[in-house]
Amino acid sequence: MKPAIQYWLSLASPWAWLGSSRFIGLAGRSGATVEVLPVDLGAVFAATGGTDFRRRSPARQGYRQLELARWSKRLGIPITLEPRHYPVDREPASRLVIAARMQGVDVLPLTHAILGAIWHEERDIADWATVREIASACGYASSASGPFYC
């Protein structure tokens, strides 16, 4: 029996971006099937007493930036610490990932591209045109005639 992984993540998480390549490699080496499940961390924080990063103290915000920079350097993965389009509405990208997953499409490359669009390329994943461009660049159809529609 193949291992199965439920991969819960925010499609706007800088930590998900930094771990994405390694996660994809791990899943590939293990032969695991991966179910990508986008989650709204803002809603999770609100329900569990967590604090959105924008409402954290300046000291905590600074430490977050420091740790992101450290991990970026350690992993050799470029990251823009303050991208133009962040915070960003994740709904269009999340809907795309969910729709593609429901059609049986391997969405790990798409998920990686969405994360990179924010944290490396500074693109706006709240914009449907951008999301369709990302899908197309990953080889996914983004019209009603394709495997999923967005």
Spans of features found by a protein language model:
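Structural alpha/beta surface segment adjacent to cysteine/selenocysteine redox centers
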Residues: L11, L18-I118
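GST-like fold's C-terminal all-alpha helical module
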Residues: V107-G116, H120-C150
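Extreme N-terminal starter segment of soluble prokaryotic enzymes
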Residues: M1-Q6
